[in-house]
Amino acid sequence: MFTMFLAIGFAIIFSRPVKATANGVQLKANRTYTAYDVTGDGTKDKIRIRAANQTDDEAYSSLTVSVNGKTAYRLKNTRFYNVIANIYTLKNGQPFLYLYAPAENGDGPVCALLKYTNGKFRKILDFTEIMAGYGNHRIGEVTNLNGNKIVITESIVSYSLGINAINFTYEYVNGKFVPTSKYGSYKEIYSADGSSRYFTVNSDLPTYTRPDATAVNTTLKTGSLTKIIKCALIN
């Protein structure tokens, strides 16, 4: 369970949105690849992602990832429409498999970074759990890789702001990904008339200097225009 703290500002800045990309290798389902190391032993592996048992409405019900001819990850009796998969390799040489199988409303049986350990792919960063308790339809993707750090964009239909996307930075330390900060930066917030981070205050809104503060710093008056910049995840 997380509590969200919103940081707001008053500067008006207009810019065109830029789609972020990460330094990864894209894999497609039902193809075999032999040019990449996914196990972390420094040698190239044979990897295949198989989507099978397609139903009348074109959804699949089975997902299998095999490495060197052996099953490393499997989902059965499930439902998804396609597979998005990428290999990301950190500066330290550790490879990870991003696997997302979306279904209705973007939800699906898996949206996670997987690490190959003892013959199996296991979740090391589950994008559906990062903001658990704050909203629905939680998914994410890696949008930048630099050294042993990744930037992820977490998309969610939140209880307070509706559809939005937030960037968080994680670093791989001692065998796991840990956030470098409790703060995330809003990439997009979708309002009724499109994407925006500017909102009109409907009623006087008290604000605080930090997430754990108890004393009100200032009050935003009804009708004032404000921009939401960041949020904090507090466990």
Residue map of PLM features:
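Structural core positions within WD40/WD-like beta-propeller blades
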Residues: 45-49, 98
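Residues in Ca2+-coordinating acidic/glycine-rich loops
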Residues: 36-44, 89-94
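Bacterial N-terminal signal peptides
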Residues: 2-12
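Beta-loop motif signature
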Residues: 189-234
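Sec-dependent signal peptide cleavage junction
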Residues: 10-24
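Short aromatic loop motif centered on NTY/YTY
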Residues: 82-112, 120-196
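A short beta-strand motif characteristic of beta-propeller blades
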Residues: 71-77, 125
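Surface loop/turn motifs at the tips and blade-to-blade linkers of beta-strand repeat domains
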Residues: 27-29, 75-80
